Amino acid sequence: MYLSDFLYIVPEITVLGSALALLVLGMFTSERRVRSMSLISVAIAAVLACKELIYFSGEEVSLFGGFVVRTAHTCLARAVVAVSGLFAFLLFFFAKRSYRYEFAVLMLFAFLGTLTLVEAHHFLSFYLSFELIGFASYILVCFNRSSIKASEAAIKFFVLGALSSCIMLYGISLVYGYASEFSLGVVSKVLGGEESLGATFGCALVLVGLLFKLGAVPFHMWIPDTYEGAPTVAVVFFTIVTKTAMVLVFAGLMQGVVIPITGFVWSMLLMAALSMVVGEFSAMQQKNVKRLFAYANIGHIGYVLAGMSTGVVTFKPVLFYVVTYLLINVWIFTVLLRYDDEGFEITDVAGLAAKNPFLAFTFVAALLASAGLPPFSGFFAKYTLLKAIGGVDAFGVPTLVCVVFLCLTSIIPCFYCFRIAKVVYFDVPTGEHSATSRNVGLSIMAFVAVTLSLVVVLLRERII
């Protein structure tokens, strides 16, 4: 281990130092100031991570005795996660919510976990990062102690999360028993040479833990209740930061460790199809807005799994899809954060066009982008992913079936998006819940998200 190794993890050191400092300073300063300082530390980390990506030489470097490996994939993943974290903290900063200062500190610790997770190259650092995200997330969900729904959601999340962590840890022990090594690079070489029942089962258990965090069917049970009960700011973090990190980590494992074991490919394709069907059809039946988006995100995970299951060639389209929907989710949450944390039903946006035409247009446009209708960015993301999956011949009929499922389930979001649009423009206001007063910060965030979505679409040929 050399001192130069620490230069690579300066973004992580910045976030960790800020979290520890604010944990103490929060007792002597205002919550607003803690929120501002946490945003500054995340912005610094994002700038440093992007700088590391820009100046990356392309040479693979092992750091801290193999616990961290600097590659093109890890540098790119860390930069994407850091920028997503910056978006999440900006939304947190502009949202007119009053939380205790520990909320910002917990978000910093969870953000630190996502940064270390995407660059982990050792099962020990991988699992510790996984748990750091988990423990911070459990507390964020139940932060509103007076809410029964939040407490119920946190208990479900904690119990199922603990179970998934145990399963993952058992899988890691099985893989170690076969490969006699915790390094992901060595494990991938061993599994690529010869398969065994023990190693295959161990990899499957490790993937179960990740699939739980992703919310793929049949490991999605915690998602709807957690989204409904948790503070909206926490949901923002889970959707924008945690999901992005988990997808990028899962993509790395699929390419390096799992793809050589061909039996996993069929399982991934099956879970992709189930996630698309269950997510989109369940979203049609929801009345609560946050539950609806929870199921919609399950459907999006199905699309991502379909892309990753077909091999290395489709990673860039998956990355394009993830970045595009990251920006769309930022766009959507600039509207959702104007409403109360609890009891946000679809009927609460009735007549929004009459009260706030700009907000109504922003909300409906974001929904149409999420549904994947042209000419919005979501359409190009789904089309690019579909084109990439359809161009892979290695897996024959299962891939064809997955393409059919993707096409059919892409139509379903139009139903509930147009239903919400109808409520926004034509229904009579109920008056029970209404959006908070004009929020210039969130409006600017919406404009930035739309602009970046347009830029990403225009530059998609270079990205892919």
Swiss-Prot record:
Top-level enzyme category: translocase
EC number assigned by the record: 7.1.1.-
GO MF entry, a single one: NADH:ubiquinone reductase (non-electrogenic) activity
Top-level taxon in the UniProt lineage: Bacteria
Gene Ontology CC terms: plasma membrane
Catalyses which reaction(s): a quinone + NADH + 5 H(+)(in) = a quinol + NAD(+) + 4 H(+)(out)
Leader peptide range in chain numbering: none
Keyword Transport appears in the UniProt entry: yes
Major site of localization recorded for this protein: membrane
Transmembrane regions listed in the UniProt entry: 6-26, 36-56, 75-95, 101-121, 123-143, 157-177, 197-217, 231-253, 257-279, 293-313, 317-337, 360-380, 395-415, 439-459
InterPro entries, per the entry: NADH-Q_OxRdtase_suN/2, ND/Mrp_TM
Coiled coil region boundaries: none
Pfam families: Proton_antipo_M
Topology with respect to the bilayer: Multi-pass membrane protein
Annotated GO biological process: ATP synthesis coupled electron transport
Keywords carried by this UniProt record: Cell inner membrane, Cell membrane, Membrane, NAD, Quinone, Translocase, Transmembrane, Transmembrane helix, Transport, Ubiquinone
Keyword presence, Membrane: yes
Compartments where found: Cell inner membrane
Assembly, per entry: NDH-1 is composed of 14 different subunits. Subunits NuoA, H, J, K, L, M, N constitute the membrane sector of the complex.
Membership in a protein family: Belongs to the complex I subunit 2 family.
Stated role: NDH-1 shuttles electrons from NADH, via FMN and iron-sulfur (Fe-S) centers, to quinones in the respiratory chain. The immediate electron acceptor for the enzyme in this species is believed to be ubiquinone. Couples the redox reaction to proton translocation (for every two electrons transferred, four hydrogen ions are translocated across the cytoplasmic membrane), and thus conserves the redox energy in a proton gradient.
Protein name (record): NADH-quinone oxidoreductase subunit N
Gene that specifies this protein: nuoN
